[in-house]
């Protein structure tokens, strides 16, 4: 079976102090069972997730799954917006938190264990969440 280019999983292997790279084979298997086939891309440096997300959306991806921590999720979210407009208004974001904090996941009441969160993606419902922009200058 070919890779589903409509779903792109963007992975930060350094999340969770490098733990994500170690557990990735298990995460990949769980995601295959819960969401079906997908294309996965691993980031290699800071800022990668934003550019990889934007590129995937511009190439027709309709679902991006972020696998990493809160910082990685922030980068992926930034890839959805360009010039204060959505890159693809029909695209959806899912996430599987494997970082050390996972504050965003906790705030939405999503299970802390990645295994449970991956299982929940089977019946995930799309919810619209407002996006804000904060700029800090000194």
Regions found by a protein language model. Name each.
Residues 1-67, 74, 78, 115-119:
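ATP/NTP phosphate-donor binding region
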Residues 34, 43, 81-138:
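Catalytic core of DAGKc-family lipid kinases
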Residues 69-70, 99:
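Gly/Ser-rich catalytic serine loop of serine hydrolases
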Residues 72-74, 103:
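Short, active-site-adjacent cap segments at secondary-structure transitions
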């Amino acid at each position: 079976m070919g890779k589903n280019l409509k779903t792109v999983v963007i992975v930060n292997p350094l999340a969770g102090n490098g733990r994500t790279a170690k557990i990735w084979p298990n995460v990949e298997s769980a995601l295959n069972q819960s969401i079906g086939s997908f294309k996965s891309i691993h980031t290699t440096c800071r800022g990668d997730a934003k550019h990889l997300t934007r590129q995937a959306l511009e190439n027709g991806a309709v679902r991006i799954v972020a696998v990493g921590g809160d910082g990685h999720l922030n980068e992926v979210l930034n890839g959805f917006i360009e010039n204060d407009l959505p890159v693809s208004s029909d695209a959806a974001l899912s996430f599987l938190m494997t970082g050390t904090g996972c504050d965003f996941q906790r705030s939405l009441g999503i299970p802390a264990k990645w295994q449970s969160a991956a299982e929940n993606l089977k019946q995930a419902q799309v919810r619209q969440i407002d996006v804000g922009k904060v700029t800090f200058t000194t």
